[in-house]
């Protein structure tokens, strides 16, 4: 098993382990050798796919721990069994938005008193740099900062993983709206298409999470995930696809003003996501700052052979 600096096994509890990223984090923690626990919440009810997923984790050696956000003591009992807690609660507005519920997790960790480190659900844009974000999407960053402030107030050691767009949502579709597949003939280009964006495969984000959670170099730090070969402009991403398919797409250039005007007609939940999109593709919020005194995942863990976007896109050809 993976050892901590204190010569103990690293016991990790993953909260949100049946979600798209959470299930990958569970698998990565098991592969890394961590003694892995997964919170089994009664809210899954008779969701057979989630039940079967939990049982598959158990077969691989994970421990299932019962706990509910409506039962504080059950959460305290769950976190008392581990050294590290990783949250992968969804922050997607148009599906489920569970960021605020992590306050209950913070309270449980504080009361338990034994958790050496907490990794809250972040993974995307650094909320500490998004004070200028437009509403209603700003709510996500406000809530993530509320979680961070609660962590600080409780004196809980932590690591924040941030800084990239998940390839499943932003890469395979060449950053197009309303689809997760590449366009066949036409593609919308945001602005001039030359703003740098960071893409990462979700499996790789999970691997970095599993590696950083007990690394003394990342304690009480922000870890940016910036795979060098995946720091691309949208135009570069499109050109990779055109090279793979040997077909040039018809390009429509969407100005920032037109993009913002189009947002106004959408439902609130979609306005939030599109606002984030604007900050990424027009303002370059993922790449407009240096790492500084914090850390960067690919430099810390060069042994992780991350998936480049040219490799990622091949499955769609």
From Swiss-Prot:
Keyword Thylakoid assigned = no
Documented EC number(s) = 1.23.1.3
Q: Which SUPFAM superfamilies match?
A: NAD(P)-binding Rossmann-fold domains
Q: In which tissues is it expressed?
A: Expressed in roots. Detected in stems.
What is this enzyme's catalytic activity, as reactions?
A: (-)-lariciresinol + NADP(+) = (-)-pinoresinol + NADPH + H(+)
Gene Ontology molecular function? pinoresinol reductase activity
Keywords for the protein's UniProt record, in alphabetical order: NADP, Oxidoreductase
The active site lies at 144
Q: What happens when the gene is disrupted?
A: No significant difference in lariciresinol content. Prr1 and prr2 double mutants show a complete inhibition of lariciresinol biosynthesis.
Which Pfam families does the record associate with it? NmrA
Whether NADP counts among this entry's keywords is: yes
Complexes and interactors: Forms homodimers.
Q: What does this protein do?
A: Reductase involved in lignan biosynthesis. Unlike conventional pinoresinol reductases that can reduce both pinoresinol and lariciresinol, PRR2 shows a strict substrate selectivity for (-)-pinoresinol. No activity with (+)-pinoresinol or lariciresinol. Abstracts the 4R-hydride from the NADPH cofactor during catalysis.
Q: What is this protein called?
A: Pinoresinol reductase 2
Which species? Answer: Arabidopsis thaliana (Mouse-ear cress)
């Amino acid at each position: 098993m993976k050892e901590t600096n204190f010569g103990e096994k690293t016991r990790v509890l993953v909260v949100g382990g049946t979600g798209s990223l959470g299930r990958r984090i569970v698998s990565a923690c098991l592969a890394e050798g961590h003694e892995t626990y997964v919170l089994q919440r009664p809210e899954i009810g008779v969701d057979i796919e989630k039940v079967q997923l939990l049982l598959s984790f158990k077969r691989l050696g994970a421990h299932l721990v019962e706990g509910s956000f409506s039962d504080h003591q059950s959460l305290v009992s769950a976190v008392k069994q581990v050294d590290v807690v990783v949250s992968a609660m969804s922050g997607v507005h148009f599906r489920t938005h569970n960021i605020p519920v992590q306050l209950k997790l913070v309270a449980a960790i504080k009361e338990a008193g034994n958790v050496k480190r907490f990794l809250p659900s972040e993974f995307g844009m650094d909320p500490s740099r998004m004070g200028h974000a437009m509403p209603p999407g700003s709510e996500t960053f406000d809530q993530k900062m509320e979680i961070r402030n609660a962590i600080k107030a409780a004196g809980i050691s932590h690591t924040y993983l941030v800084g990239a767009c998940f390839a499943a949502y932003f890469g395979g579709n060449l950053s197009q709206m309303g689809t997760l597949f590449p366009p066949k003939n036409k593609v919308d280009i945001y602005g001039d298409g030359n703003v740098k964006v960071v893409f990462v495969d979700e499996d790789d984000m999970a691997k970095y999470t599993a590696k950083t959670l007990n690394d003394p170099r990342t304690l009480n730090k922000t870890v940016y995930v910036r795979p060098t070969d995946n720091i691309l402009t949208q135009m570069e991403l499109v050109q990779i696809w055109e090279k793979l398919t040997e077909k040039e797409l018809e390009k429509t250039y969407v100005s920032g003003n037109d993009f913002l005007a189009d947002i106004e007609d959408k439902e609130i939940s979609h306005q939030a996501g599109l606002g984030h999109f604007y900050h990424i593709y027009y303002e370059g919020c993922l790449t407009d700052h240096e790492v500084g005194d914090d850390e960067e995942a690919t430099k810390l863990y060069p042994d992780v052979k991350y998936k480049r976007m040219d490799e990622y896109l091949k499955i769609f050809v």
